[in-house]
């Protein structure tokens, strides 16, 4: 089984549970000799901020010298991002091994009418890998809720509920209290549950979790303060308890991130107590400062000010608006795309009034129609609202509208952020292909199917570049390269959420035709065209070759 085939199998699994609960994950883990019994776990639940909190907790524990696993969702470029050990993604070989072993059992369960979901299986894969990697502790971000979430198959030594707001009401309940009750179920047996919740949510958590440590800006067991912003993406923070305190910096901004940092400090101290590890203030401060977390008020450019944020519900949008208020900029240009099950009007109402909006559709089957999103903004009083399609084009449109000193903000979903980030993080790699052996090695590394590799290997005699693209962009580039007279080989269709490796080969003339077509089409691939032209040397003043494969 090739890696892309393993990923395709995972992504083809259903997305919604037939039978809520942890029994299915527990049964799958039993096929792997119950690896969850061999690892110390931390669970982080919450409506917002649980990913950031999990990352900060992991960073502090690593700074303490522990081998630490981290499980988060969703991923930006590859499913391997979801499971990491000491910052390194789960290897492709481990993904293949897990799927090869699990597939017969999973197929049999599906045939019996009791299939597992993608999230359940990937959660089991992460837990198995953490045991295989002999981690000292693993931090798990809860997917949804708490009590019935797949991650609750473990018995955590420490756990948190970052906060509670109305979300996933069809599954979790119609009130904050109902949702809080389900999230409180992650409470560990021997440590207080840590929470940044307030009001009715906190009262409910106290009723159902027993002992609780509260973290907040006022009237809490652990008090936090967000200090001055040091840079666009770093701020000072203080965390003060009765017998310890931390004065440091975090690579995240906003009062809510200060609360998350406080929760992470308490969790890390609880784990250290359980494992008998020393954890002083200096270690906490150093760990927090290394906890970079993409897609959370991530500044991509400073003039115009371009920000990507995964705010995906009204509460997160309200927090984002508060952070924005601390920045000086001219006009505000929004790029907005969200899933269909969100409260779009409440999200829009929580945001500052925009000067322009481009509504778009992330490449996900749950994405809301951009026409619907545009109408929501119009009904809320926005004047300049444009209906776009793909995220890349929407970002390009908003950026073209922005003058110096303006702000471009892309938000609404982490799926949107994942696609938007490609504008800045995409790499086009020149490859030195001297002979058939080099071509074979390249195509194998790119996970190109055997038949396509055999055809492409014979043609890899000109310039060769490798890049990773979203699924629909990969299809567009493939068709354009073939039309241009070049050759293109892609990894098997891994599906939504997984970038496809694309290997292009051809003469300079073929690359010229390809990039000219991509730049002219309205598919948001003009930036890709520019990167490819630069990579193969088409923009060299002397017209000569760049240092690429020949």
Stretches found by the model and what they are:
Residues 71-73, 196-197, 209-231, 249-254, ...:
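Beta-strand->loop->alpha-helix junctions that form or flank phosphate-binding loops
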Residues 481, 546, 550:
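Conserved, mostly hydrophobic/aromatic
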Residues 1-46, 53-66, 110-111:
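Short functional linear segments
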Residues 40, 137, 149-152, 158, ...:
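Nucleotide phosphate-binding/pyrophosphate-handling subdomain across enzymes
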Residues 200-204, 208, 345-407:
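C-terminal helical cap/extension that packs against the catalytic core
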Residues 138, 161-247, 261-286:
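Acidic, Mg2+-coordinating active-site environments of NTP-dependent enzymes
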Residues 22-37, 63-154, 173:
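ATP-dependent carboxylate-amine ligase catalytic core
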Residues 442-539:
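N-terminal accessory interaction module
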